[in-house]
Amino acid sequence: MTTQLEQAWELAKQRFAAVGVDVEEALRQLDRLPVSMHCWQGDDVAGFENTGAALTGGIQATGNYPGKARNATELRADLELALSLIPGPKRLNLHAIYHEAPEPVGRNEIKPEHFKNWVEWAKANKLGLDFNPSCFSHPLSADGFTLSHADDEIRQFWIDHVKASRRVSAYFGEQLGTPSVMNIWIPDGMKDITVDRLAPRQRLLAALDEIISEKINPAHHIDAVESKLFGIGAESYTVGSNEFYMGYATSRQTALCLDAGHFHPTEVISDKISAAMLYVPRLLLHVSRPVRWDSDHVVLLDDETQAIASEIIRHDLFDRVHIGLDFFDASINRIAAWVIGTRNMKKALLRALLEPTAALKQLEENGDYTARLALLEEQKSLPWQAIWEMYCQRNDAPAGSQWLDNVRAYEKEVLSQRG
């Protein structure tokens, strides 16, 4: 007997076909766009170094919801549940502080073997891995400077950390058969009026050049650099500004990372994608939700998330844009946060793929802006949810809010035992 879901699917297929959209092709294209989930939502960016260091770098995870992961075993178990509730291809994004070295190791001495468990787990779960050096929450970043530090020894420590991180990233790519995108973000900046804004940027430029001087196979590893407007304790000056990294990525042909929360509240990264793509080979997107500042709230299916997805699809940037998530909310169930945010990103991509873009572009070229606006608004109410639910069913993921039942059961059976 035909189920209600299948009936809705057939009717939705007809509705989209009427506006020239092939929904089966849309689903095939959706599978070309893995979303890289960030491991740090699971433990509030604590990592496994167990030094007791506070979270620094001008970032903040607020809330104290019970049950956060305390070690790699718990974090991977939580991730496995989240992954099972999200349809389609995924990746996992790791920070360097999530290594599993058997003994304490300096960040400048991390090695691929310290991440062997993650690689084996990724293979078992059919995931690609991405990576990040961790230039925060460390005694040598306590004064707010890392790669741009005026002290040669401290700066070299962080240079060596990022160099070591690139080798870990390349190991991921080599082992998993898909390049690891390694993003370099540093918190460097000053709280108050800064007299010499040039020297730290000169040091950062030289440090980055030294870091990327070691040639690595791009089939295994991709370098990305990320700007930021400000952070807590660095309100007046950020060394790695948008202009700095746009210039760096353009001149060195690295990937450029655009984080949705790293600009002025009235700026949106969806508007930056098409401009940046003219000058850099690749973009890494950190999709987040800034509320008045870079608060890293859970991603919603809101206008900006949709606009980001639409830019990727409309300009056929499948092979040049890498989609990552970057939020950390400790006030709600952390597994639910992963599921909500990642499903929303995938929903936005699907909705973009279901848009009759060719027809809309033709109206725009013809100067018929009335019809363009009318059709843009009408297509919002087309039955995309029926397509989403079929996609979930085909990928053995819950179609609707039933996924929350799985999370609640796990919370009762597992998370509640963590204290």
Swiss-Prot record:
Pathway the protein acts in: Carbohydrate degradation; L-rhamnose degradation; glycerone phosphate from L-rhamnose: step 1/3
Subcellular location: Cytoplasm
Enzyme class: isomerase
Cofactor: Mn(2+)
Residues binding Mn(2+): H262, D294, D296
Keywords for this protein: Cytoplasm, Isomerase, Manganese, Metal-binding, Rhamnose metabolism
A molecular function (GO) term: manganese ion binding
Enzyme Commission identifier(s): 5.3.1.14
InterPro entries per UniProt: L-rhamnose_isomerase, Rhamnose_isomerase, Xyl_isomerase-like_sf
Pfam families (alphabetical): RhaA
Catalytic activity: L-rhamnopyranose = L-rhamnulose
Highest taxon in the source lineage: Bacteria
Cofactor details (free text): Binds 1 Mn(2+) ion per subunit.
CC per GO annotation: cytoplasm
Main location per the UniProt record: cytoplasm
A GO BP annotation: rhamnose catabolic process
Function comment: Catalyzes the interconversion of L-rhamnose and L-rhamnulose.
HAMAP family assigned to the protein according to its UniProt record, in alphabetical order: RhaA
Record note on quaternary structure: Homotetramer.
Sequence similarity: Belongs to the rhamnose isomerase family.
Protein name: L-rhamnose isomerase
The organism of origin for this protein: Enterobacter sp. (strain 638)
